[in-house]
Amino acid sequence: MLLLPHQYPFITMRTLVIGDIHGAPRALIQVLQRADIQHDDFLIFLGDYADGWSETPELLDFLIGYRQKHRCLFLRGNHDALCYDFLLGKPMDTLWRLHGGKATEKAYLNVTHERRNAHLNFLAELENHYLDSKNRLFLHAGFTNLRGIAHEHFEQMFYWDRTLWEVAQSCNLSPTDPHFPNRLKLYTEIYIGHTPTTRLGSDKPLSFNGVTNVDTGAAFKGRITIMDIDTRDYWQSDPVYTLYPDEQGRNI
C-alpha cells in the first residue's frame, strides 16, 4: 500500500518529481543515482515511460521492481495510454509509430506473455492526477475545465492537453487582474511533463505562472530530470541520446 506524505507527519523527506522517460532506463538509473534517492523520499513520476528509445520493456520491469523498495506514485502519460492499447492488441496507426511507437513495437517482439501481462497491469494502474495536502497538483499534461480536475469531462485531457502549458507561458497578467486565467488560480503549484522544454530552447525545467514543466526532452536531444519541489533543486541525466548512440529516439 502506498503511504502518502501527509501520512508521515514526523518524517523529513523529499518530494521529487520525475519528468518524461520514453523507454530510456539507462538515463533514469543515472539520474536516480545523481539525486541520491533515500528510502523516505516520495517519488512522483509524471508519465510517458513508453515510446522513443528501445528499452520500454526493460524500463517497465525496472519501475515495477523499484516501487517495491521506494515510495512511488506513477501518473499516466499519453504514450503510456498508447502503449497499453498496443499491448492489448488494438490496431495502432502510423502516427503512433512515427512518434516513438516503432521502437516499442520492435522491443516487444521477443517479450514473454507473462512480462507483457505484468506491463499491462502496471499501465492499467497508473493514476491520472495527484493533488497533495498543500494543494499542489501533479499530472502529465493538463486539464481544460475552468473549475479544475474534479470537473474535467474528458479524462484523456489529463494526459493529452497542451493548452494549460500554453496559457501559463503566454499570460503576462497579474494574478489579481480579473482577466487572469481561472485555471492558474486553482492550485498552489502545478507540475507537468508532456511538452518538452527543448521546444523553448532549454533542456532545464521551466516555470510560468505556477506551472512547472519537468519534461526536458528525453525523447529527443534532452535529458531526464528529477526535481525536489520544496527546494527547487534538480538533477539531470546526460543527454539521453548519448546513452543510446546507435538509436534515433524520436529524432526523426
Where are the language model's segments positioned?
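N-terminal active-site segment of His-dependent metallophosphoesterases
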Residues: M1-F62
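A short acidic-Thr-Gly-centered motif at the start of a beta-strand
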Residues: L2-I11, Q33-D36, G65-R67, Y130-D132, ...
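Active-site-proximal beta-strand elements of phosphoester/diester hydrolases
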Residues: R14-H22, R136-G142, T212-V214
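Divalent metal-coordination and catalytic microenvironments
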Residues: D20, L43, D48, G77-N78, ...
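Active-site environment of divalent metal-dependent phosphoester hydrolases
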Residues: H22-A27, D51-S54, D80-Y84, L131, ...
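Active-site neighborhood of divalent metal-dependent phosphoester bond hydrolases
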Residues: G52-D132, Y159-N172
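His/acidic metal-ligating clusters that form di-metal
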Residues: R115-L139, T144, I149-R199
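Conserved beta-sheet core of the metallophosphoesterase superfamily
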Residues: S174-T242
